[in-house]
């Protein structure tokens, strides 16, 4: 009898340092902190086993399949510099383990039960290499960067947005008024806050109607295409699609979804609906910090960003580097490139563990949002470049003269920065000077400069390599 019962070390089956990775494998880089006394090879192999074909004991049904064909393999382990008893374990998964076009299934395997595993004290997924063969099974973003620019007829600069505040408590009509004022003043977009769904003080249908009116009116008056991210997130997928259908009937350009609280299944359904019906899709990452903020456990945001590009979204919030929400510059730019570019080289200094080829999957616009104001504009323009959305909530609505002047101040600041950059000036060095010059001929900008000249929201960076 070939079957031998009992418990054997994972590393005998799942640690294979001689393995040559295939182009079709999904590759994962895990930061593993083993329990005291557990050797790194065993911990790495345990991760590979528990996230693929393994279980805690030998089972006779193993003989009914080819483990060699289907098992995950830990093929390389390296210590983490500056940390004791922490290792990066590289695991290769055969493509056959995953359902086509399902981020849900991919995550259920790779970041499922294994994170509660006793032999590992902590576990963090740092990066994933999605092979081209798997990428091709996803639709990806409904439209992507180029199509969005063509729909909006806006080129050569970042787009400007604003989250309507106070985020909860306004009636639909007052909310619509704030939307109109911001768009009329010069913003491209306004945004529902992520927690605005359909509450007693403002039901979704009323909000959609008043915001649509604000869009039509501001478009007619400015001659520019405007949008408001109508949050379609709901308690059920059916209700979510119902809201997206209503948005389409109002002929608005864009809807919004909270992809982590809503879930990848709902998000992918909405992305498919948006592509089929010409709606852009703005994605908010509420709940990401629950998953990505701990350095040694959870999942890095670059993995959540890659997963979103597969699942589908045209915009996603990606930190600011300069505002109230954290994000280290090089690391942030690493996953911003993973969102926008077609091909990204491995670069460990930016936290990118694998070369990623997106094979023409559309790109996603990164959104910088949270605690930013006119003085940040030169830095944001320089860091994020043209293909981005810069969102000023308090930085628009907090203007001493009101919402429309707040929008004017931001638009003037942005246009001044883009013009200066195109003339070859150094935004990093001359940023303050550029804003000061522009404020001489824009009283709205001058007032904004005065209000926010002393504001600093800076703490020690937490996301380090």
Swiss-Prot record:
Keywords for the protein's UniProt record, in alphabetical order: Calvin cycle, Carbon dioxide fixation, Chloroplast, Disulfide bond, Lyase, Magnesium, Metal-binding, Methylation, Monooxygenase, Oxidoreductase, Photorespiration, Photosynthesis, Plastid
N6-carboxylysine modifications at: 191
Annotated substrate binding sites: 113, 163, 167, 285, 317, 369
Cofactor: binding comment: Binds 1 Mg(2+) ion per subunit.
Catalytic activity reported: 2 (2R)-3-phosphoglycerate + 2 H(+) = D-ribulose 1,5-bisphosphate + CO2 + H2O; D-ribulose 1,5-bisphosphate + O2 = 2-phosphoglycolate + (2R)-3-phosphoglycerate + 2 H(+)
Residues given in the record as Mg(2+) binding sites: 191, 193-194
Alphabetical list of CDD domains matching this protein: RuBisCO_large_I
Keyword Magnesium included in the entry's annotation: yes
Entry's Gene Ontology molecular function annotations: magnesium ion binding; monooxygenase activity; ribulose-bisphosphate carboxylase activity
Pfam families referenced in this protein's UniProt entry, alphabetically: RuBisCO_large, RuBisCO_large_N
Cofactor: Mg(2+)
PTM comment text: The disulfide bond which can form in the large chain dimeric partners within the hexadecamer appears to be associated with oxidative stress and protein turnover.
Location of N6,N6,N6-trimethyllysine modifications: 4
GO biological process, one term: photorespiration
InterPro entries tied to this protein: RuBisCO, RuBisCo_large_chain_AS, RuBisCO_lsu_C, RuBisCO_lsu_C_sf, RuBisCO_lsu_fd_N, RuBisCO_lsu_N_sf, RuBisCO_lsuI
Subcellular location per the Swiss-Prot or TrEMBL entry: Plastid, Chloroplast
Annotated site, Transition state stabilizer, chain positions: 324
EC number(s) stated in the UniProt entry for this protein: 4.1.1.39
Note: The basic functional RuBisCO is composed of a large chain homodimer in a 'head-to-tail' conformation. In form I RuBisCO this homodimer is arranged in a barrel-like tetramer with the small subunits forming a tetrameric 'cap' on each end of the 'barrel'.
Role summary: RuBisCO catalyzes two reactions: the carboxylation of D-ribulose 1,5-bisphosphate, the primary event in carbon dioxide fixation, as well as the oxidative fragmentation of the pentose substrate in the photorespiration process. Both reactions occur simultaneously and in competition at the same active site.
Family the UniProt entry places it in: Belongs to the RuBisCO large chain family. Type I subfamily.
NCBIfam families per the UniProt record, alphabetical: PRK04208.1
Protein name: Ribulose bisphosphate carboxylase large chain
Organism whose genome encodes this protein: Ulmus alata (Winged elm)
The organism's taxonomic lineage, starting at the top: Eukaryota, Viridiplantae, Streptophyta, Embryophyta, Tracheophyta
């Amino acid at each position: 009898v070939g079957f031998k019962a009992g418990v054997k070390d994972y590393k005998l089956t799942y640690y294979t340092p001689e393995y040559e990775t295939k182009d079709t494998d999904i590759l994962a880089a895990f930061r593993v902190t083993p329990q005291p006394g557990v050797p790194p090879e065993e911990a790495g192999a345990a991760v590979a086993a528990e996230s693929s074909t393994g279980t805690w004991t030998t089972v006779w049904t193993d003989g009914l399949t080819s483990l060699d064909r289907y098992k995950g393999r830990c093929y390389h382990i390296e210590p983490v510099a500056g940390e004791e008893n922490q290792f990066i374990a590289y695991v290769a998964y055969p493509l056959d383990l995953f359902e086509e076009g399902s981020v849900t299934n991919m995550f259920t395997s790779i970041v499922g039960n294994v994170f509660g595993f006793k032999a590992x004290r902590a576990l963090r997924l740092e990066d994933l290499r999605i092979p081209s063969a798997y990428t091709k099974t996803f639709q990806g973003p409904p439209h992507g960067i180029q199509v969005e620019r063509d729909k909006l007829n806006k080129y050569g600069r970042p787009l400007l947005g604003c989250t309507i505040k106070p985020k909860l408590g306004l009636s639909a009509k007052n909310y619509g008024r704030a939307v109109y004022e911001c768009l009329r003043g010069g913003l491209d977009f306004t945004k529902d806050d992520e927690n605005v769904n359909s509450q007693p003080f403002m039901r979704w249908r009323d909000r959609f109607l008043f915001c649509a009116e604000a869009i039509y009116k501001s478009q007619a008056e400015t001659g520019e295409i405007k949008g408001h991210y109508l949050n379609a997130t709901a308690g059920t997928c059916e209700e979510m699609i119902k809201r997206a259908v209503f948005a389409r009937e109002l002929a608005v350009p864009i809807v919004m979804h909270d992809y982590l609280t809503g879930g990848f299944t709902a998000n992918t359904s909405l992305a498919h609906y948006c592509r089929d019906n010409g709606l852009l899709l703005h994605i908010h990452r509420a709940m990401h910090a629950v998953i990505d903020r701990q350095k040694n456990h959870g999942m890095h945001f670059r993995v959540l960003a890659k997963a979103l590009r597969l699942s589908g979204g045209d915009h996603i919030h990606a930190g600011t580097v300069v505002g109230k929400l954290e994000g280290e510059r090089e690391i942030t730019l690493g996953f911003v490139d993973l969102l926008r570019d077609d091909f990204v080289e491995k670069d460990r200094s930016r936290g990118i563990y694998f070369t990623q080829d997106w094979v023409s999957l559309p790109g996603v616009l990164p959104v910088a949002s949270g605690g930013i104001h006119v003085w940040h504009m030169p830095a944001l323009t320089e860091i994020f470049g043209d293909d981005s959305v810069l969102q000023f909530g308090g930085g628009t609505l907090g203007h001493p003269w009101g919402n429309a002047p707040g929008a004017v101040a931001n638009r003037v600041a942005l246009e001044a920065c883009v013009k200066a950059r195109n003339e070859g000036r150094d935004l990093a060095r001359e940023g303050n000077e550029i804003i000061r010059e522009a404020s001489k001929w824009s009283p709205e900008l001058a007032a904004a400069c005065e209000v926010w000249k002393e504001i600093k929201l800076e703490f020690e960076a937490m996301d380090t390599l």
